Amino acid sequence: MQLLPHDTVEDILERVPVKSLLRFKSACKQWKLTIESQYFQAKQLICSAGGKDLNLVLVSEVPKRYHIYQLFHNSCDGLVCLFDYQTLNNIVYNPATRWHRRFPVSSTNTWRYINPSSPYRINTSSSRGHALYVDGSLYWLTGKKEIKVLALDLHTETFQVISKAPFAEADHRNIITRSLNNRLCLSVSKPLQQMIIWSFNSENKTWEQIYSIVNRSVTQSLPVAILEKNKLLCCPRSNSRQLMIYDIKTKSVDSVSIGTYRCGDSVFCYFESLISIL
């Protein structure tokens, strides 16, 4: 039987789950070199993120007597960041491969400052100080009288303030930053009345209103993901054991059970990857 060209084999391997890819590294030397290459890992991540299957991470509370790690709010290229309360270390972890790397605390002088620094102070102790990662940049809400979006490009290490937002005068307590379809989105809610979701176009620096929802149960929820373009996956704020799928066209709501788990503020999409940090 004639062997398949290696390019064809690569196309097949890109669609294989990460757990299987780790086993396939033992099949032959060529497969091992392919799977461990940065080029293949980047292609596998694109394939995983663009697939129809959706993986969710639900963060549950556990008793403080256990040695626990705080999970930050979303993932980046299949990696999550954990904080160790005992050692005060940050840990980058790949749930799919079990790879991890521990980073030293800031007091060890192994970190450097970004210059020029942020034009606004980032208060990490408040909900507005929580960063959102989208497509190579970190985003924060900032400003007092006028809501603005602060962006940090991780490639150029430069800050930028995104002003002229259509929600600039909204109550910051009703604004939530989310990554939907790999774009920065903000939901602006009027509880029990309306939820408007804005999407940011990073190329022309403009905001586009993509949804306006008046369903009561949805306006009190957190948007998680866009499904099939016309459906919005939401998480209730009531620590529920169910997620909601809102159909934009029919304006109907379906419930999705998550078993014994409860959802809260920390619910985000996750895509498997082979990525690690050298």
From Swiss-Prot:
Database matches in SMART domains: FBOX (SM00256)
InterPro entries assigned to the protein according to its UniProt record, in alphabetical order: F-box-assoc_dom_typ1, F-box-like_dom_sf, F-box_dom, Gal_Oxase/kelch_b-propeller, Kelch-typ_b-propeller, SCF_F-box_component
Domain (F-box): residue spans on this chain: 1-43
Record-annotated disulphide pairs: none
PROSITE patterns assigned to the protein according to its UniProt record, in alphabetical order: FBOX
Name used for this protein in its record: Probable F-box protein At1g14315
